[in-house]
Curated annotation (Swiss-Prot):
Cofactor note: Binds 1 Ca(2+) ion.
Protein species of origin: Naja sputatrix
A Pfam family reported for this protein in Swiss-Prot or TrEMBL: Phospholip_A2_1
Compartment annotation: Secreted
Lineage of origin: Eukaryota, Metazoa, Chordata, Craniata, Vertebrata
EC id: 3.1.1.4
Biological process according to GO: arachidonate secretion; fatty acid biosynthetic process; lipid catabolic process; phospholipid metabolic process; positive regulation of fibroblast proliferation
Record flagged with keyword Ribonucleoprotein: no
Cited InterPro entries: PLipase_A2, PLipase_A2_Asp_AS, PLipase_A2_dom, PLipase_A2_dom_sf, PLipase_A2_His_AS
SUPFAM superfamilies: Phospholipase A2, PLA2
Signal peptide: 1-21
Domain of life (superkingdom): Eukaryota
Family the entry assigns: Belongs to the phospholipase A2 family. Group I subfamily. D49 sub-subfamily.
Protein name in the entry: Acidic phospholipase A2 C
Length: 146
């Protein structure tokens, strides 16, 4: 790629990041957030971002409850999607629809997008069916997730 093009690309990508104090969210995680809000409208997305051993960054140990198990399954699903050539689940966008709490992954998604959409759809449905325990939010990972 031409060095001038790289410089322009870097400026376009970096300048919006410095304009905000909020860290940017990969596009797919934004879609996943919206899927969760579709199936669990009475809870904030952030309630799931630091829950148990698997909801949020990383994941290890035994899930603390059914909701945490949803996140473990979602992590594993992304791991399977990564086996598709050039598939990066955290950045792959897809087409889907939310209608009255029902999620549908639309046709026209390529293999990677279809897999990632299904991972997110199944996790959002799982979240809706699992009880939320406030005691499992922001837990001590070193003590409880070995």
């Amino acid at each position: 790629m031409n060095p001038a093009h790289l410089l322009i690309l870097a400026a376009v990508c970096v300048s919006p990041l410095g304009a905000s104090s909020n860290r940017p969210m990969p596009l797919n995680l934004y879609q996943f957030k919206n899927m969760v809000q579709c199936t669990v409208p009475n809870r904030s997305w952030w309630d799931f971002a630091d829950y148990g051993c698997y909801c949020g960054r990383g994941g290890s140990g035994t899930p603390v409850d059914d909701l945490d198990r949803c996140c473990q399954v979602h992590d594993n699903c992304y791991g399977e999607a990564e086996k598709i050539s050039r598939c990066w689940p955290y950045f792959k966008t897809y087409s889907y629809e939310c209608s009255q709490g029902t999620l549908t992954c639309k046709g026209g998604n390529n293999a990677c997008a279809a897999a990632v959409c299904d991972c997110d759809r199944l996790a959002a449905i799982c979240f809706a069916g699992a009880p939320y325990n406030d005691n499992n939010y922001n837990i001590d990972l070193k003590a409880r997730c070995q």
